[in-house]
From Swiss-Prot:
<comment type="subunit">
    <text>Homodimer.</text>
</comment>
<comment type="similarity">
    <text>Belongs to the UPF0210 family.</text>
</comment>
<dbReference type="InterPro" id="IPR007841">
    <property type="entry name" value="UPF0210"/>
</dbReference>
<dbReference type="Pfam" id="PF05167">
    <property type="entry name" value="DUF711"/>
</dbReference>
<protein>
    <recommendedName>
        <fullName>UPF0210 protein LAF_0976</fullName>
    </recommendedName>
</protein>
Amino acid sequence: MEIEKIQETIRMIADENLDVRTITMGISLLDCIDSDSDRACQKIYDKITTKAQDLVKVGRQIEAEFGLPIVNKRVTVTPIALIAAASGDADYVKYAKTLDRAAHAVGIDFIGGFSALTQKGYQSGDRVLINSLPQALAETELVCASVNVGSTRSGINMDAVKDMGTVIKRASELDLMANAKLVVFCNAVEDNPFMAGGFHGVSEPDVVINAGVSGPGVVKAALEKVKGQPMDVVAETIKQTAFKVTRMGQLVGTIAAQRLGVPFGIVDLSLAPTPAIGDSVAQILEEIGLEQVGTHGTTAALAMLNDAVKKGGIMACSHVGGLSGAFIPVSEDAGMIDAVNAHTLSLDKLEAMTAVCSVGLDMIAIPGDTPAETISAMIADEAAIGMINNKTTAVRVIPVAGKQVGETVEFGGLLGHAPIMGVNKASSAAMIHRGGQLPAPVHSFKN
């Protein structure tokens, strides 16, 4: 029995694209706050390069020792809007460049936390950070940014929603890849190891290790053995597979934390696809019985997948967190791309899917002439789904200058490529320009 399980794990890694997607070190920068921004940036650089100096080395040691691929080594930091506010600077590009320099120095893949938490209104640093985003993302390579515009407890900051549409539009004019590194959240979590939305929350320890696993190919392979079986058998199969995948993530995260001398935080149970064939969430849904993802029944299949992954993962690891569900990024999933090209999967269907899955409208390319207010309205819709359902939702859309529906844009690497998707032509501008605060729902009042 044990030998069979060992062989199964080897098969998962060798044939089914099982990997640890990331080990992410969260680092608090609260002790780096300084009214002099040059001094603050030096403190930030010194702390990151000290705390994370062995992260990549330890990751590679674990890979070699256990034969487990760890795709990314990353760092998240305290939202920079909180750190930089003391400086009084007119923009925070300097802080972004410091993060980028530190990330290059320690050899990590990404650094997240050029972020602002604006769900109930703007603090002094928030507006400055948001206005800095286009230039900061265009002039750095490894820095990821996020802005939380709403929460179930606070409602939705419609001024921030309006501003983010404009920011995304401006960023797309400076650099195609800028918006691939920017996520707009509702109900953002403090312990997310995934990019581009990861940041280190203020209630987290000084330094912590979080792990993110990935196993769409493993789940699909398991489901191939239960063709035609009832849905409860399908759910049980997914649950058992998620258990095994999560156990591996916990093992890697715990060992990494021990060797780095820092606490272990959580395993994020998310199924994160890649553009590789056989590493697709869409293909899991098709294995469940859909001819192509996007057709009727897609939302139900995704809801079951998401729930079964959570149930299996929670059994495997006592500390789970992050986003924990199924990611549906269009450009990073071969099956999603095929469905968009076949006109089976639309933006409206993707929005419905986000009501039952892990994040939201993710890595979606839209025409470059899409108005900023339309982008803001897409953010508002997603934030409303998150607010009402008490879950994390997000938007990572990429307006591509000069491209129209039906054309394709190439991002490269883990980000893949994406067909340009059509948006509704009717204007939402009058609603977006109202601004203000969209009140929290009645069920948010829990005390």
